[in-house]
Every structure is written in structure tokens, then in C-alpha cells.
């Protein structure tokens, strides 16, 4: 999944289905469970000193935030196939870069939004400084981006392949 222009998020059908399942769980069984926790904690008495109540309310807030995020994401999603394997850096691709052209100092990452993040590969969003710097470049190109401290940085695109995870 990747954010593209105009806040449209590109998703594979599999990713879309996974996020939709999560939303259905959060708006169904998870809401029922947290409501039951809050009700049980409320019955314990004084709410000002009721740690279980406050923990359940905090959990409820996190769940509702995730519901809003997923709803917005799925409403703006464009479901389609993975990007073409044409060597052009695009959302949904695994990119390998060399910092300052030094092929011994490389980084491989998935160019996608955080919902696509997994533990097996580092993920950078297309809106991040590095992501926006490499977006649209081809294998072999040198790309520039701005570091958080304002200094320019240069990378060479070594590989750009569709993500298959």
C-alpha cells in the first residue's frame, strides 16, 4: 500500500481485504469487548481512582482512533495490481539505494505507507524525505533529498522491484 497524489492510497486486493477485516473486527467484536470492560470497571465504584476503568477508556480511545484511520484509508484506497517491474521507483516497490554512490553503504526498503510496514523490511512512506527524493527515479539514477537537519543528501538507485510480501 502506498500513498499517491491527492491522498489516494494504492493497495493490493490482499492488503485491502486485510485492512477491511481489521476494521470489521474493531467495529464489531472489539467494541463489544471494550464496552464490557468499561462496564465491569464502572461497577467497581469510584471512577476517580479506578485504574481498570481508565485503562479500558484509554484502550477504547486507541481503538476508535484506529477505526477512523482505517475508515479514511479504505475510503481513499485505489485497489489494483502491484506496480510494474520496469525499474522506476513507485509506491509498492522494494528499493535498494547506495548513499552518496557508495555501493558498500546501501539500504533496502519498501516504499509504502505505514499500514504496509512489516518486521521483515524497513518501510519509508512516499511523503518522507527519502521516499519523495527517490520517487519516479530509475535504476542507475542519482537522486537528492533533504535530511531532517536541512542538509542535502545523495543516493543512487541500485534496484527497484515490486513488493511480493
Swiss-Prot record:
Record's keyword terms, sorted: Coiled coil, DNA-binding, Transcription, Transcription regulation
Gene Ontology biological-process annotations: DNA-templated transcription elongation; regulation of DNA-templated transcription elongation
SUPFAM superfamilies named among the record's database cross-references: FKBP-like (SSF54534), GreA transcript cleavage protein, N-terminal domain (SSF46557)
Gene3D superfamilies in the record: Transcription elongation factor, GreA/GreB, C-terminal domain (3.10.50.30), Transcription elongation factor, GreA/GreB, N-terminal domain (1.10.287.180)
The keyword Transcription is annotated on this UniProt entry: yes
Alphabetized Pfam families for the sequence: GreA_GreB, GreA_GreB_N
Example GO molecular function: RNA polymerase binding
Stored InterPro entries: GreA/GreB_C_sf, TF_GreA/GreB_CS, Tscrpt_elong_fac_GreA, Tscrpt_elong_fac_GreA/B, Tscrpt_elong_fac_GreA/B_C, Tscrpt_elong_fac_GreA/B_fam, Tscrpt_elong_fac_GreA/B_N, Tscrpt_elong_fac_GreA/B_N_sf
Coiled-coil features, chain-numbered ranges: 55-78
Family: Belongs to the GreA/GreB family.
NCBIfam families: greA, PRK00226.1-3
Function comment: Necessary for efficient RNA polymerase transcription elongation past template-encoded arresting sites. The arresting sites in DNA have the property of trapping a certain fraction of elongating RNA polymerases that pass through, resulting in locked ternary complexes. Cleavage of the nascent transcript by cleavage factors such as GreA or GreB allows the resumption of elongation from the new 3'terminus. GreA releases sequences of 2 to 3 nucleotides.
Protein name, UniProt field: Transcription elongation factor GreA
Biological source species: Streptomyces coelicolor (strain ATCC BAA-471 / A3(2) / M145)
Amino acid at each position: 500500500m502506498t500513498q499517491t497524489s491527492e491522498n489516494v492510497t494504492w493497495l493490493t486486493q490482499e492488503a485491502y481485504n486485510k485492512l477491511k477485516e481489521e476494521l470489521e473486527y474493531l467495529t464489531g467484536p472489539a467494541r463489544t469487548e471494550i464496552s464490557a470492560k468499561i462496564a465491569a470497571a464502572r461497577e467497581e465504584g469510584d471512577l476517580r481512582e479506578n485504574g481498570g476503568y481508565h485503562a479500558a477508556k484509554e484502550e477504547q480511545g486507541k481503538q476508535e482512533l484506529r477505526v477512523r484511520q482505517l475508515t479514511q484509508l479504505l475510503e481513499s484506497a485505489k485497489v489494483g495490481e502491484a506496480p510494474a517491474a520496469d525499474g522506476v521507483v513507485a509506491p509498492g516497490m522494494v528499493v535498494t539505494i547506495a548513499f552518496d554512490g557508495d555501493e558498500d553503504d546501501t539500504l533496502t526498503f519498501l516504499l509504502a505507507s505505514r499500514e504496509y510496514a512489516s518486521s521483515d523490511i524497513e518501510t519509508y512512506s512516499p511523503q518522507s524525505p527519502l521516499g519523495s527524493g527517490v520517487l519516479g527515479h530509475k535504476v542507475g539514477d542519482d537522486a537528492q533529498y533533504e535530511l531532517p537537519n536541512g542538509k542535502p543528501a545523495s543516493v543512487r538507485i541500485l534496484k527497484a522491484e515490486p513488493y511480493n510480501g
